[in-house]
């Protein structure tokens, strides 16, 4: 595939990958036998070396690797996929080191479950949608994360909840928090596909790297309503608001995200211009949906927390909105643990 183009400017692509040889003690002056295309030799169910029709063809080598990866006898592929999906829903994988299933990685907490899920996924069409459905409808996933008196014995035996006797309480990802605020305002753009959107101001710099300023971006621009997955990521200059919520930078490999609770997060969720503008937009929507403060409070909790307020909450929130304004009430709701955390 790399050789199928017209030479331009005198460039002549090589006919295939150059030969690679094992070096004695890593010394380039002492080459030993040539290495042929292959994969891991520790998997007894699959051949360690690829049988390619043309050893020198780069495309044939890649095709052989692809066939090796999706082979039904390859245990690593299916285990790795289901482990990462499990990690997405529970906060940590059955194997806590998703990038390392080897000797230096963590031991699986539920090896039989990992194998069962891997085989089920492999033999049922490899549908990620069906795998998500299977997990979220399980009794394990539907457990509460609240501590109960009956769980005191389990708390003593497994304080870190490795064996999932309750659900883990987790904070929403940075992208989910941003999208949840947009959803509450009614401005979330659900269009799928298309190019990413640059949600920052970009001006030429004195050198190669341009000047990026997130604070000068127009938060009323339609581009700011796209879902977070369509944000343009500038790898070396991440969005400070998203970074404060543990959104990883684009220039690092992050198999497991940090999940912290810090003062900086509280300050960002209360003072950032993005939160302030979304609070104003949310208040505008509430005024259009409710004729008085009581109705607006009722709708506000339905849109942010998915429930109706209690009588005590209703009285307190109405008094707060009357004294400090509906915009500040919306900002308070965006900062509630019930909005930011998943129980």
In which residue ranges do the predicted regions lie?
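Terminal end segments
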Residues: 260-263
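Primarily short, surface-exposed interaction patches in extracytoplasmic proteins
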Residues: 1-223, 248, 252-257, 273-327, ...
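Terminal recognition/anchoring or ligand-binding modules at protein termini
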Residues: 339
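Active-site Gly/Thr loop motif
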Residues: 237-245
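C-terminal, charged and often intrinsically disordered regions of DNA end-processing helicases
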Residues: 229-230, 244-248
């Amino acid at each position: 595939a790399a050789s199928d183009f017209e030479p331009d400017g005198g460039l002549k692509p090589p006919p295939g990958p150059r030969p690679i040889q094992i070096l004695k003690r890593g010394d380039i002056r002492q080459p030993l036998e040539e290495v042929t295309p292959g994969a891991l030799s520790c998997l007894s169910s699959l051949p360690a070396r690829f049988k390619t029709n043309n050893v020198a063809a780069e495309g044939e080598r890649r095709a052989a690797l692809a066939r090796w990866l999706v082979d039904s006898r390859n245990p690593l592929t299916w285990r790795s996929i289901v482990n990462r999906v499990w990690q997405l829903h529970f906060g940590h994988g059955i194997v806590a080191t998703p990038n390392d299933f080897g000797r230096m990685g963590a031991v699986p907490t539920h090896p039989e479950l990992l194998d069962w899920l891997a085989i089920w996924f492999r033999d049922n069409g490899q549908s990620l949608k069906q795998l998500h459905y299977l997990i979220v409808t399980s009794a394990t996933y539907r457990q509460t994360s609240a501590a109960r008196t009956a769980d005191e014995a389990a708390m003593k035996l497994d304080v870190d909840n490795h064996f999932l006797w309750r659900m883990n309480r987790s904070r929403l990802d940075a992208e989910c928090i941003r999208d949840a605020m947009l959803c509450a305002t009614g401005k979330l753009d659900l269009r799928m596909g298309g190019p990413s959107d640059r949600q920052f101001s970009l001006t030429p710099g004195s050198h190669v790297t341009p000047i990026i300023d997130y604070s000068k971006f127009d938060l009323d621009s339609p581009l700011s309503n796209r879902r977070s997955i369509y944000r343009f990521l500038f790898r070396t200059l991440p969005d400070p608001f998203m970074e404060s919520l543990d959104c990883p930078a684009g220039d690092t490999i992050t198999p497991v995200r940090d999940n912290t609770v810090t003062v900086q997060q509280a300050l960002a969720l209360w003072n950032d211009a993005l939160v302030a503008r979304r609070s104003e937009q949310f208040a505008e929507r509430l005024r259009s949906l409710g004729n008085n403060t009581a109705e607006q409070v009722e709708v506000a909790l339905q849109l942010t927390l998915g429930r109706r307020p209690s009588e005590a909450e209703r009285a307190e929130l109405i008094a707060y909105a009357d004294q400090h304004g509906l915009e500040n009430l919306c900002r308070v709701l965006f900062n509630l643990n019930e909005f930011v955390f998943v129980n």
